[in-house]
């Protein structure tokens, strides 16, 4: 009998490990090869097929324990490095899914190679292992370093930390700090040198947690020693500016509020301080109020469309305003309810002189028969209607004739206007006409007002000029940001009164606010001409080539991203399947990519301007969207009658289609294009050049498919809200996906400090100095980051430590 040589247990274990590694490698290669073949049929890159075949072959050789397995894998890795450099150069985040998996494979292959060679080449293998381990360590460390940073140059700040005389301290009495909407405060007690000493001075909790689609996005205002805030369901709260203690709360008890509850701000009116009140001969005179009663007023609009005035001192309704303190805003609108409100108010009302100027929010994507986008002005003293601007019928200047309504479904103004008291103009950022993604039935008269900036005469409500930012908008490119007013150099030693308008397209338009003519060059460019049946598209669209553009570069297959090469490949396949020919590719019956997406670019947070340096501060969103027009005959409409839609479907009643829409995400639930998905940035309005940029926030608190990241990796996340800038050269911002209030150097963009919040914030911070203690505070509302499961009801004030 022959002796049978028994295989050593150690050898069996090694063979098993080699086999498992080979199987995993072969399966990965098979996936890449099969999916890569599909990509090729769509006109995409050949890399994945070739790399997949190489990995498949190497995996089979590992299973068979052949030394050539390592060599083939090495060739695949060398080719991958060359391909990655050719596609994206040395840009870090695009490199991650291309190279990181191969660094792991390379490390394992180096460690396993001696088992294929019976111990030969052990030294070389371990050297290779060390190299791959070092590269992985360097790469892992680089994950926590901001990339794509453009750093600005320091600017001198004159006499920081000085005490501005109290009579020169302006209250933060408007939503955007001032009528110009610059979100600027001259306060400089908190400086770049001491901002790292900020601590929580007080915290107030409203007791109301926003649920469902509701959000707590409020920016408080401050007048004297009182801070005023409002909750998503329209409660108004007055707080002591030094202690945060509640002075009063007013609950208007709105009815039938089931969705989209928001209150981004309240406004302030003090009749005695109006310098140039408008005189209205056809209105009844203001009632003579009891001395001290409603001498100072808080103006609020509820989610059920009531305009209110409340005594700023007591929190009680001002009985001489409207009907015992309230005006019904649904008058003249026609039908506004169908299970859910089709008309509401989410932004702060605008108080200009002795007027309250209002637009309104309408439910996107529902119908061609939605409430009017009429803009109205009411007497801040009596609540009477002073004028109305009906975009579809200029003949209506107050209430519509009996039995009629304001023109239905005209473009609306749901954001915040700015106003120039000297010019007597109010500037309206308008939305696009309903229903957002199909415009075949839109009247010609109202087309020019869609997604535009419109200047109205403050006294009469008559149009002075209009500038459109997107022609025949069928992409939901509402002008969401409040206009910012600032005087820019004319190059001749003088100044031009400018209006700076951010848009969802990532374009920044700089206009002469007297005439609406561009100051920075704007040109019309040709855009794709295909469109859905019954609709049409404009031949050209306006591009602000005289100002920097953010996040608006056309996407290509190379821009697709993923956490691994698997989901990156799937994103590339999905991208090639989409109907996309660049910006302004019109929605169609195919899946159509919209980029910049309809969240932005720049959304409702708006810009901040340092009035000393002329720096403009912005934050954006870079998330593509996918839409599809579905013929109405192919859809079960019974699901859509409530007006809520099903999932990501809107009914668009009155059109031939319903609309499906969603974010363009990978199978792992992350955006398909490379980071950053949101940035902070600054533009010098004098030179019209970008001066700095940095990714906005980290994934630390992001929840993806139910898993919390918990890693402060600064990918640059989508942003909401806006920034506030101080006279000491600090920009405060909190609208990131992670839970921090940040302080940035306005000149360089460098992060100076960040304070941890209990939940995320979507609101714009504000700052003020207490007239009682002289202490400067920075206040932020933390109600929860967008799409975060963590909700809150916090109003938090930060300040420097009190002096002993």
Regions found by a protein language model. Give the residues of each.
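N-terminal pre-domain segments of enzymes
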Residues: 129, 138-186, 541-566
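Long, low-complexity segments enriched in small/aliphatic residues
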Residues: 418, 541, 545-625, 633-635, ...
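Short, solvent-exposed loop/turn elements at domain surfaces
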Residues: 179-186, 208-213, 237, 436-437, ...
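Topology signature of small-to-medium multi-pass alpha-helical membrane proteins
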Residues: 2-153
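Asp/Glu-centered strand-loop micro-motifs enriched in Gly/Pro and often flanked by an aromatic residue
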Residues: 185-195, 200-228, 252-253, 280-288, ...
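Hydrophobic or amphipathic alpha-helical targeting/insertion segments
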Residues: 104-117, 122-145, 150, 238-246, ...
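Repeat-blade elements of multi-bladed beta-propeller folds
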Residues: 172-176, 213-233, 260-306, 341-368, ...
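Extracytoplasmic/lumenal domain signature
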Residues: 194-207, 236-260, 268-276, 280, ...
């Amino acid at each position: 009998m022959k002796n049978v040589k028994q295989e050593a247990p150690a050898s069996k274990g090694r063979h098993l490990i080699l086999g498992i590694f080979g199987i995993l490698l072969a399966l990965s290669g098979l996936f890449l090869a099969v999916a890569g073949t599909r990509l090729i049929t769509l006109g995409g890159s050949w890399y994945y097929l070739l790399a997949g075949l190489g990995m498949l072959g190497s995996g089979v050789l590992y299973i068979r324990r052949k030394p050539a397995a390592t060599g083939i894998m090495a060739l695949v890795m060398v080719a991958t490095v060359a391909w990655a450099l050719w596609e994206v150069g040395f840009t870090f985040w695009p490199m991650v899914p291309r190279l990181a998996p191969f660094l792991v494979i390379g490390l394992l292959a180096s460690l396993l190679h001696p088992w294929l060679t019976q111990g030969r080449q052990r030294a070389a293998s371990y050297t290779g292992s060390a190299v791959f381990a070092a590269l992985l360590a360097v790469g892992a460390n680089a994950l926590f370093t901001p990339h794509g940073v453009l750093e600005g140059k320091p600017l001198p700040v004159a006499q920081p930390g000085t005490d501005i005389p109290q009579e020169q301290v302006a209250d933060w009495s408007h939503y955007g700090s001032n009528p110009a909407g610059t979100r600027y405060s001259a306060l400089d007690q908190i400086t770049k040198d001491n901002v790292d000493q900020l601590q929580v001075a007080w915290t107030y909790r409203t007791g109301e947690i926003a649920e469902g689609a509701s959000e707590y996005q409020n920016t408080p205002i401050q007048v004297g020693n009182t801070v005023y805030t409002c909750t998503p369901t329209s409660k108004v709260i007055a707080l002591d500016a030094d202690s945060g203690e509640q002075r009063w709360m007013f609950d208007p008890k709105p009815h039938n509020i089931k969705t989209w509850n928001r209150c981004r701000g309240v406004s302030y009116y003090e009749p005695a301080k109006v310098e140039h009140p408008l005189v209205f001969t056809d209105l009844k005179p203001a009632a003579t109020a009891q001395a001290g009663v409603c001498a100072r007023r808080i103006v609020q609009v509820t989610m059920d469309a009531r305009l209110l005035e409340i005594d700023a001192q007591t929190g009680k309704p001002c009985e001489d305003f409207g009907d015992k303190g309230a005006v019904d805003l649904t008058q003249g609108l026609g039908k506004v309810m169908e299970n859910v409100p089709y008309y509401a108010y989410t932004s702060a009302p605008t108080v200009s002189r002795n007027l309250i100027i209002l637009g309104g929010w309408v439910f996107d994507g529902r119908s061609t028969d939605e409430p009017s986008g009429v803009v109205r002005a009411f007497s801040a003293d009596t609540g009477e209607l002073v004028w109305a601007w009906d975009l579809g019928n200029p003949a209506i200047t107050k209430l519509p004739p009996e039995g009629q309504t304001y023109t239905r479904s005209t473009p609306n103004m749901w954001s915040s206007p700015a106003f120039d008291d000297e010019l007597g103009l109010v500037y309206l950022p308008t939305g696009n006409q309903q229903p957002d993604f199909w415009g075949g039935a839109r009247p010609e008269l109202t087309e020019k007002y869609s997604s535009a900036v419109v200047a109205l005469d403050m006294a009469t409500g008559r149009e002075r000029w209009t500038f459109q930012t997107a022609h025949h908008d069928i992409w939901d490119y509402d002008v969401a940001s409040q206009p910012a007013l600032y005087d820019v150099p004319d190059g001749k030693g003088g100044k031009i009164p400018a209006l700076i308008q951010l848009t969802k397209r990532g374009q920044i338009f700089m206009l002469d606010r007297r005439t609406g003519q561009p100051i920075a060059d704007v040109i019309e460019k040709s855009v794709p001409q295909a469109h859905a049946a019954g609709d049409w598209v404009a031949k050209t669209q306006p591009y602000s080539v005289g100002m920097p553009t953010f996040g608006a570069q056309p996407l290509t297959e190379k821009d697709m991203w993923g956490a691994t090469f698997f989901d990156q490949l799937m994103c590339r396949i999905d991208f090639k399947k989409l109907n996309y020919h660049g910006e302004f590719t019109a929605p169609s019956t195919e899946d159509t990519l919209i980029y910049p997406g309809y969240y932005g670019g720049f959304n409702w947070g708006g810009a901040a301007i340092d009035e000393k340096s002329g720096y403009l501060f912005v934050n954006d969103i870079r998330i593509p969207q996918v839409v599809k027009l579905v013929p109405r005959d192919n859809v079960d409409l019974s699901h859509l009658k409530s007006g809520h839609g099903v999932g990501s479907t809107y009914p668009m009643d009155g059109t031939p289609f319903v609309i499906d829409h969603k974010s363009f995400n990978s199978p792992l639930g992350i955006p398909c294009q490379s980071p950053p998905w949101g940035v902070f940035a600054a533009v010098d309005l004098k030179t019209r050049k970008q001066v700095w940029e940095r990714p906005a926030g980290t994934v630390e608190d992001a929840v993806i498919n139910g898993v919390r990241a918990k890693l402060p990796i600064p990918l640059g996340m989508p942003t909401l809200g806006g920034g506030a800038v101080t006279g000491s050269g600090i920009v405060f911002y909190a609208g990131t996906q992670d839970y921090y209030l940040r302080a940035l150097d306005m000149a360089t963009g460098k992060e100076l400090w960040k304070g941890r919040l209990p939940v995320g914030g979507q609101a714009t911070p504000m700052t003020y100095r207490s007239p009682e203690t002289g202490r400067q505070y920075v206040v932020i509302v933390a109600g929860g980051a967008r799409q975060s499961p963590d909700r809150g009801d916090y109003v938090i004030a930060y300040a420097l430590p009190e002096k002993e």
